[in-house]
Amino acid sequence: RDPEMSRGLGDVYKRQIYCAARVLGKPAHIVIDEVTSSLRPIKECFTKENGYPEDLCITSETALHKVDSRTLVMVVDTNRPNYTECPELLTKTKSIVVFDHHRQTSDVVENPILSYIEPYASSTCEMIAEVLQYFTENIKLEPSEADCIYAGILIDTNNFMTKTGVRTFEAAAYLRRCGAEVTRVRKMLRNDMDAYKARAEAVRHAEVYRGQFAISVCPADKIESPTIVGAQAANELLNIIGIKASFVLTPYQGKIYVSSRSIDEINVQLIMERLGGGGHLNVAGAQLTDCTVEEAKQKIQNTLDEMLEEGDIE
């Protein structure tokens, strides 16, 4: 799992579930505690002026007051309790549904009534776009809702360059028919100047290790969502000839967030699992604690050395 992207994408996925609940006539809420700069354009699409209830988005504290034994809790884009916005919410009801495209680990949501996990899907957005098409209630998405789902696919696939299959394009085509507009989505995903400069700095100061691995640090000061910028920098580094995998470290809130990316030859998921993280073949991440940035870089280099010697990567 690439943990630094979860906060940026989570709100996108939750809004898809809300769309289904709305058509079914069921009251629904999105649990979100912090609205970052990356989420703000998405949240602004779902205001009271646009026909959405004022209490569409609620905090974890409010959710814990509202939940009862009849509440259905839907977990999207993760199957690990600690990666959810409010892990305690999962203990308050027995009706839990999980939608995810990440491989399961030992730490999973326990006893869901439905667990739809498809590791071969490009994104949870792709999965839910498919499900929405087969509702007997004939769900009609609003253009702004289709925009958000389309944006989620773009983010997870790095503009259709990673983990993209036939189903991905079919989901995108469905969303375009629902009114998703590429220009609006592009504006939604733009960075501010400070974030753009930080990403450029991370790419500029990258070091090449053993001739094929790019390792860099993303500065976190003056940026509202530094971990997302670090993930973007990791994607950028793959555009350099000869780089098989990239690793960008972002020190933030007492942790070192590691974003790792590859194109096809290196399984970064295996590398990140050695560091306590996980993800996919080409997109993965980890969170390191109790170490400095230099110590984290050394851990990555040592892990690469070990795996090269053992033949786990080439």
Q: For each of these PLM feature ranges, what is it?
A:
Residues 77-80, 133-136, 257:
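Short, motif-level signal for alpha-helix interfacial/capping segments enriched in acidic residues
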Residues 61-64, 84-88, 115-119, 138-140, ...:
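A generic local secondary-structure boundary/capping motif
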Residues 52, 56-111:
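Active-site cofactor/cluster-binding pocket
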Residues 101-172:
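Short alpha-helices
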Residues 96-98, 113-116, 213-215, 248:
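Conserved beta-strand scaffold positions in the cores of enzyme catalytic domains, especially
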Residues 1, 7-47, 64-72, 150, ...:
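Hydrophobic helix-and-loop "lid/oligomerization" segment in the mid-to-C-terminal part
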Residues 17, 90-93, 114-115, 171:
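Glycine-rich, phosphate-binding/catalytic loops in enzymes
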Residues 41-44, 86-87, 108-111, 129, ...:
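Short acidic, glycine/serine/threonine-rich loops at helix termini
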